[in-house]
Amino acid sequence: MAPTLLTTQFSNPAEVTDFVVYKGNGVKGLSETGIKALPEQYIQPLEERLINKFVNETDEAIPVIDMSNPDEDRVAEAVCDAAEKWGFFQVINHGVPLEVLDDVKAATHKFFNLPVEEKRKFTKENSLSTTVRFGTSFSPLAEQALEWKDYLSLFFVSEAEAEQFWPDICRNETLEYINKSKKMVRRLLEYLGKNLNVKELDETKESLFMGSIRVNLNYYPICPNPDLTVGVGRHSDVSSLTILLQDQIGGLHVRSLASGNWVHVPPVAGSFVINIGDAMQIMSNGLYKSVEHRVLANGYNNRISVPIFVNPKPESVIGPLPEVIANGEEPIYRDVLYSDYVKYFFRKAHDGKKTVDYAKI
């Protein structure tokens, strides 16, 4: 039998939705009311819940790559191999100062610990900029079952724009996180590009691979019935590359291309989790894989993560790169306007890998 909401604060599901979504309390606010059972709108269909027997059955693990290895060719080979076989890998000794990572994680907690009146200033209805958005779940109006996550989404336009519109309490730390990560991001994209016969990351390719940046500050509060819901549902990212900083709680799972199992990505202190996005899969004509992943809810700890989504410019047209199909390889994707692709992704609920079909020939 489905659990019911065991608190007198809400008399029906509509009141929960109003409290969480429209009044800006998020699931953090809901969790802090002391609810003892999961509201019905968060209960996922059975097939969307992650059953333990499908996790790590084969002791699979995504690759961990040491970027300080002096053999540059070896590092590049490991990155490209992981991009082809896993679509995910972790990097250590990446050159981003650890204090920068600690600072942005602390700033994430500070933002979500603000009074709801302060956070509400950044909801879709109240934000002074379309580049700043505080919200909950993924796409509440399109979802049959909501996800147990709150977020602050920050689309980087310029430091001046960020100074004007981003929340004071996390702005400087997030900008520093972006700036200190750029060298590593460029290095990874150069490796991936050279393997696609892209000789250099010139201005045109830079615009295509990393022309826009979005950062999310994600918050996954303690959940009363974590086995019945998800923090984030099955999906692949629409980015070229995603750079994920996670705390020590864990919960990220990746679908193995080899076995189909869900594989936990254990937190490694000071590391980043890197994953290929749909845009890179399309531009590589399917050589690099954007892979399904999801995040579990948990009943013991509040969790945060801070992904940087490295994207083409919205006005870019993405399709198989000329360098990839120059030798006669048949394109399996058509050219699409990147902003159209992103709009298609965000107007529906998470649905695994279906978004990339939008670009298939």
UniProtKB/Swiss-Prot annotation:
Q: What is this protein's tissue specificity according to the annotation? A: Highly expressed in roots, especially in the cortex.
Q: What class of enzyme is it?
A: oxidoreductase
Show the catalytic activity: (E)-feruloyl-CoA + 2-oxoglutarate + O2 = (E)-6-hydroxyferuloyl-CoA + succinate + CO2; (E)-6-hydroxyferuloyl-CoA = scopoletin + CoA
BP terms from Gene Ontology: coumarin biosynthetic process; hydrogen peroxide-mediated programmed cell death; phenylpropanoid biosynthetic process; response to iron ion starvation
- Per UniProt, which keywords does this protein have? Dioxygenase, Iron, Metal-binding, Oxidoreductase
User: Is-annotated flag, keyword Iron?
Assistant: yes
Origin superkingdom = Eukaryota
**Inducing factors:** Up-regulated by 2,4-D treatment. Induced by iron deficiency, mainly in roots.
This protein's pathway reads: Phenylpropanoid metabolism
Q: This chain belongs to which protein, by name?
A: Feruloyl CoA ortho-hydroxylase 1
Q: Which gene encodes it?
A: F6'H1
